[in-house]
Each structure stands twice: as structure tokens, then as C-alpha cells.
């Protein structure tokens, strides 16, 4: 009877531990969306993260440039925004026209 009681106790403790660990793993998605990734990869890099919780601060775990990495997310489009707009493109700061020679944005390097 002693060994079967020990076995029941061990199984019970294992189940309680597994349930407790699953409760801690609650994956809360951080704000923003992952930037667009147009890079074609022949081989994926090892992941640097698996969920947003693996990343510090506001960074999200996103697939970018051939592997999962912690990156600064882009803001989601506001309701009624242009759905075809590439939100991952780094737009220059306001007032860039005054700082760039000429009137064409193609003549001014973007950030």
C-alpha cells in the first residue's frame, strides 16, 4: 500500500504543477502590429523569441528578416484609414519638406 500511495501522491503533484505552469503562461498580445516583411529567405534563422512576453517593453515577437525577433511594432490603422497603405514604411517626421531641397519627396532621403 505504501508504494501505491506514493505513486498517487507523485501523479497528483505533477498534475497540480502542470496546471499551475499553464496558468502562468497566459500569452497577452502587446499593442500594435508586426511590420511588413518582404524579405525572401532560403533558410530561417533560429528564433530569438516565441511570444510577445519574451520581449522587453513594447517590443513584439514578430517574424522579420528570416526569423522571429523582438521588434518595435507599428501602430494599427485607425478606423477609416487607408487599408492599402504600407504601415511599416518609415515616414519622415512632420516638416520634412522644409528640410529637404526641392519639392519632391524622392529627392529627400527618408529616415
Swiss-Prot record:
One BP term from GO: antibacterial humoral response
Species lineage: Eukaryota, Metazoa, Chordata, Craniata, Vertebrata
Region (Disordered): 80-111
Protein name, UniProt field: WAP four-disulfide core domain protein 12
Entry keywords, A to Z: Antibiotic, Antimicrobial, Disulfide bond, Protease inhibitor, Secreted, Serine protease inhibitor, Signal
PROSITE patterns in the cross-refs: WAP (PS51390)
GO cellular component entries: extracellular space
Domain WAP: 27-74
Entry-linked InterPro entries: Elafin-like_sf, WAP_dom
Disulfide bridge partners, by residue number: 34-62, 41-66, 49-61, 55-70
Gene3D superfamilies per the UniProt record, alphabetical: Elafin-like (4.10.75.10)
Amino acid at each position: 500500500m505504501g508504494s501505491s500511495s506514493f505513486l498517487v501522491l507523485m501523479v497528483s503533484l505533477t498534475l497540480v504543477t502542470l496546471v499551475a505552469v499553464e496558468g502562468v503562461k497566459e500569452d497577452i498580445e502587446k499593442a500594435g502590429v508586426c511590420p511588413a516583411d518582404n524579405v525572401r529567405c532560403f533558410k530561417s534563422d533560429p528564433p530569438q523569441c516565441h511570444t510577445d512576453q519574451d520581449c522587453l517593453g513594447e517590443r513584439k515577437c514578430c517574424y522579420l528578416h528570416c526569423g522571429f525577433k523582438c521588434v518595435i511594432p507599428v501602430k494599427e490603422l485607425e478606423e477609416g484609414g487607408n487599408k492599402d497603405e504600407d504601415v511599416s514604411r518609415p515616414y519622415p517626421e512632420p516638416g520634412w519638406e522644409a528640410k529637404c531641397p526641392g519639392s519632391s519627396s524622392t529627392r529627400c532621403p527618408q529616415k
